[in-house]
Amino acid sequence: MTPPDTSAGTGTDAGTEKAIATARVPVSLPGTADGTGPSPAPPEWEDACRDVAALLRASPAGTGSLTEVAALGVRDELSQEAVPAGDLAPRVHLYGHHALIGPFPRQDGARRDGGVPCPRCLARRWQSVRGRALRDALELGSGTRAAGQPPYAVPFLTDAMAALLAAHSEEDPAADGPFPAVHLLDLETLRAGRHLLVPDPECPDCGRRVPDSPEAAEFTLRPAPKHRPGAFRVRPVSEYELPVTAFAGPVCGALGPGVVHDVASASTSATVGCFELRSGEYLRETFWGGHADSYADSERIGVLEGLERAAGMRARGRSPQVRASLAALGDEALDPRACGLYAEEFHRANPRVVPFSPDREITWVWGYSLRDRRPLLVPEVLTYYSAPGLENRFVQESSNGCASGGSPEEAVYHGLMEVIERDAFLLAWYGRAALPEIDPQSSKDPRTRQMVDRLAMYGYEARFFDTRITFPVPVVTAVAVRTDGGTGTLCFGAGAGLDPEAALAGGLCEIATDAVNIRGRAERDGVRLRAMAADFGKVLALHDHPLVYGLPEMASHASFLLGRRGPKLPMAELYAPGARMLPVSDDLRDDVERCVEAVTGAGFDVIVVDQTLPEQRDLGLHTVCVIVPGLLPIDFGWQRQRALRMPRMRTALHAAGLRERELRADDLNPAPHPFP
């Protein structure tokens, strides 16, 4: 076989060279020579893109129209400004030995509104699921260089691309569901695959972010009937049009490159996924997952959680408009000091994090006070826990209070339950409260009793404690205790809800998944965890808190809760109707109103910030962040524990009749909380 003539450096034969010369026309490449656009592709890829575009136009399998071709992995798509490309936006992207075909404008011309992704969305989604080496090179380093001349400007390859381009005009866009498909063509095997593309709300070309405003923050509770008695959802998870592959996929997954089934789990059919969001010089991993009885259900639940995480990390649906000091805003804004601040020692050890000052200008977003029934400005960092700029995050919030639902009322209910749950857990842990123990065998739910028995089969006793402190809302602390006292000793969880059965099941779900894994994780990470047990200052991250309690030597810090063996009380007795229980309605609006009344009646406000992503709204979902200033916030990292400095930590147990006096510093648990 005679090798092709490569003297021109293109890897193409004479006939192909002629076709390219005949068909080539000037095209608008993503990289411009005058420097006004994004950085250009390396010359080798720029030439390859021009040649492929020319062959596509000349291909008998195509339509004869001009097609823009661009390279991926040659510039930072997550930071560059949009390039007005009009109808010549790239419909073919090349990278490695692959070609991505699409996305395409809708036939009715509705391309830049209504949630139809553009080629820039594809480039951004593609980059977001690449490996760290490539992302660091594009986003932090000096970029990438071509390893050689791409050999793909040959007719039999471009004919395949052209056929896919032509085929899209015959497809019914509705057949793909809520999101359109792009096609991945392997240029070595010609194998083609379809991948769903979710629009990027932050896309500078077609993103649907809207300016934040007090009008947009207005919030009115409306009827939200539950889909069945005993549920606290307006519809079951199965009713959402939720294509998992659109969110967890290796090409352009909106929530990461894939979802993993934990086939080794001995309790639930757990799944886990992860996406990475840049925070300065490092990529922050954000995990999401589901813990149901089947992997299919766990995948769907996990995607919903992943969307909730993405919505709460930074303002993707709305763009903040207010930057001012608290002193300038006055009572139009929430004073973040009511939510707790770090000690001076933290800021001395972390000088990059600038402490809050009333005179310092910060970014604010609009929320809505359900108590005062008015819009209220809230510090961005209290709502979006990965807001840009580490130095601006005078506190590092978490997803506490962030929740999703099929209606705003559903989302508010679950967000408020989470805030109440974390507050009660921290009060009990740091206040070393003696809590009534619940008999799980008195549960009316056979699934609860069966899971407790399953944990016992694997060597764990599941124990549950009534953790109601201030509010008439059932909160249950769940603990899985390894019965032989070995590594993987303790595993904690919690649940809250107006239905005590649901609250107990929520805590059980957490420990059922984690308990069967904590032994192996604690053994693998034993050296680091033992260093934490000896010096709590080394407890730095979220996972450190639960994992360190996998060590037997940490069990003594939970003896206030687990060391005594009183009677286990039946649920019917503990949760009998009365002053410490709220009635349950068939409508979530009524449930929310009763809960808000209980919280505001105790002297607190309830603030709601709408975090809903455009793609969530397209699916009929809503996400909110619920903030109750004055309740204890959950923090991760021993130096960050705001709860220990807040007035409520000293007064709440006494006010609830659980302590004879207010707590002093030496009354508090000296060990980090074990909340997962």
Identify the meaning behind each predicted range:
Residues D5-E17:
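Small-residue-biased low-complexity repeat regions
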Residues P105-V116, S169-F179, G389-L390:
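Intrinsically disordered, low-complexity coil segments
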Residues T2-P4, I20-P26, G73-L78, A82, ...:
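Helix-biased "structured C-terminal domain" signature
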Residues T2, A21-G31, P42-D159:
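E1/E1-like adenylate-forming module used to activate ubiquitin-like modifiers
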Residues P40-P43, D47, P446, D590:
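Alpha-helix boundary/N-cap detector
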Residues L157-P173:
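Internal hydrophobic alpha-helix adjacent to the cofactor/substrate pocket in enzyme cavities
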Residues V116-R120, R124-Q127, D159, A163, ...:
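Residues on a specific face of well-ordered alpha-helices
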